Design a protein with these regions (language model features):
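A short glycine-rich, His/Asp/Glu-containing loop-to-beta-strand
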Residues: 3-11
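Double-stranded beta-helix
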Residues: 119-133
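Short, charged beta-turn/beta-strand-edge "cap" motif at the junction between a beta-strand
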Residues: 99-103
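A short beta-turn/loop motif at secondary-structure boundaries
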Residues: 2-3, 109-111
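A short alpha/beta connector and helix-capping loop motif
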Residues: 110-121
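Catalytic core of non-heme Fe(II) oxygenases with the double-stranded beta-helix
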Residues: 10-95, 105, 112, 127
Length: 133
């Protein structure tokens, strides 16, 4: 029998230019709930700081998972999946394996804060009734 344990949780309040660098967590699963997203991705990518870059390389305000990879010839690369966030994501929970590397990019178009609730979940394994104590 397994018991689900909310190991930790916290609120993130991020303002313009703030970000979370690439990281992962030590639990089994993690989650993020977007409570407030004060910007629109389509507005963010038009910011003048991105002139001269490909639209696909512009990631302001985004949440991204990535993992290194290599092919049979030893060529190294990175696979990624990017969530282009806007107000429509408010109230959405994303649940993922904690060891999956992820990052949060800064936003630029507003002085309002982005608010998320994040946490880590573990399992406790009970082999018999005496282990529950």
């Amino acid at each position: 029998l397994k018991k689900v344990k909310l190991e930790s949780f916290w609120a993130n309040h991020q303002y313009k230019y703030e970000f979370n660098p690439p990281h992962n967590h030590s639990a089994v699963y993690s989650f993020v709930i977007w409570l407030k997203i004060p910007y629109n991705y389509k507005t963010e990518i038009l910011d003048k700081r991105f002139s001269g870059t490909k639209v696909i390389d512009r990631k302001p305000g985004c949440f991204e998972f990535y993992t290194p990879n290599s092919d049979t010839l030893g060529n190294f690369g990175i696979d990624s999946y990017t969530y282009q966030l806007d107000k429509s994501w408010e109230g959405t929970m994303l649940f993922f394996p904690s060891n999956l590397t992820h990052q949060v990019f800064p936003f630029y178009s507003t002085d309002e804060k982005r608010i998320t609730l994040s946490g880590n979940i573990n399992f406790e394994l009970f082999l018999n009734d005496t282990d529950k104590k």
